[in-house]
Regions:
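Short amphipathic helical patch at the helix-1/turn junction of helix-turn-helix
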Residues: 78, 113-114
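Conserved catalytic-core motifs of GNAT/GCN5-like acyltransferases
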Residues: 109-111, 124, 129-144, 150
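Conserved GNAT acetyl-CoA-binding A-motif
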Residues: 99-111
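Short glycine/proline-centered loop/turn elements that form peptide/ligand docking sites
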Residues: 92, 116-119, 136-142
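Short, conserved catalytic or adaptor-binding loops enriched in Gly and charged residues
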Residues: 1-2
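Acetyl-CoA-dependent GNAT
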Residues: 5, 9-83, 89-102, 136, ...
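Residues at secondary-structure transition points
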Residues: 35, 86, 114, 141-142, ...
Length: 166
């Protein structure tokens, strides 16, 4: 794929680009603020990856809770002008690889609008399954619906990982 960018850990220098992409995807009133992204970026129990080629084109944020066996995808955003290039797929795969490295994490979950057919197709193709419907999850109209599906994926251990416990 000649259009592949570099996927890397996000840093504070990416805040403006991340915030701008969020605004492009969700509009002013529905977006996370720069302050919220700064918190998510620097929070000890989170992962933020960006995909970059001539600037940041997309990002994913995954949250971890101490002692929990489930990681949560908080958001996966790709610039509307860059969609259809596999950026979301690559970000999702990279995030899953990072999550597999966390001891005790066995599953990854997310919520997605019941009306967001593109995202639903992406997640289904990646092996996520719907486990429930959350009514009025968003509290506002999001892709033509206020409801969300909860989706989960069971994660296999990282390649070469043994089952021996110390």
């Amino acid at each position: 794929m000649g259009d592949d960018g570099v996927i890397r850990q996000a840093n504070r220098d990416d805040l403006d680009a991340i915030t701008a992409i969020e605004m492009e995807c969700f509009g002013d009133s529905l977006s996370y603020s720069r302050k919220q992204f700064r918190y998510l970026l620097t929070k000890a129990h989170s992962l933020c990856l960006v995909e970059e080629k001539d600037g940041v084109r997309g990002f994913i944020i995954v949250l971890f809770r101490h002692g929990d066996s489930v990681a949560a995808i908080e958001t996966l955003d790709v610039r509307p002008s860059e969609r259809g290039k596999g950026i979301g797929v690559r970000l999702l795969q990279a995030a899953e690889e990072h999550v597999r490295q966390h001891p005790g994490i066995r599953r990854i979950r997310l919520e997605v609008s019941t009306g967001n057919e593109t995202a639903l197709a992406l997640y289904r193709k990646a092996g996520y399954r719907v486990t429930g419907r959350l009514e009025d999850f968003y509290g506002y109209d999001h892709h033509g619906s206020r409801d969300a599906y909860r989706m989960v994926k069971d994660l296999a251990a990282p390649s070469g990982a043994g089952t021996h416990s110390p």
